[in-house]
Amino acid sequence: MDRSGQAGNTIIVVWSDHGFHLGEKEHIEKFALWEKANHVPLIIVDPRKPKSAGRVCSSPVDLTCLYPTLLDLCGLPAYPANDGLSVASQVSDPSRTIAKPALMTYGFGNHAVRTQRWRYIRYADGTEELYDHKNDPNEWNNLAGEKQYKKIIEEHAEWMPKTNAKPFENLR
């Protein structure tokens, strides 16, 4: 890009898949709402923001942020139908707080909400999981059944989708 003269005005975005589980939580596929199945790298480099170069934003985001963020960084109007929010302010200053938690969905009615500390999962059958990433980064201890976490569950449940899209036919 340096030779083309475009390095100074090209935003670079790199993200990746997470690969398969290799037996974690007795699971060998990648179709799950746990951290290992959803934590993927995301790198956004804006050459106009040199102060943030090489800095890491530790707040979880989901990939619905990509399109709104690129619109924002390019100075284009936001598209109101987008589910995601721009994280352009975190590209400029990675220490800034993200306005909403990351949301993941797998299958019909199965969702997870990930905040800095917690992952809350609610399945279509009503079962729940809650993990404290400060004390349990591998998500071995489901806290959802413990009364002292009721408020945390309620706060995270507010971010769950209110409606579900019809599933694709024959989707595994």
Which positions does each model-derived feature cover?
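Residue-level signal for alpha-helix termini/capping positions
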Residues: 2, 6, 92-95, 148
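C-terminal cap/loop subdomain of S1 sulfatases and analogous C-terminal strand-loop tails that border
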Residues: 18-27, 62-67, 71-133, 138, ...
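An amphipathic, aromatic/His-enriched active-site/gating alpha helix that lines ligand/cofactor pockets
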Residues: 146, 150-153
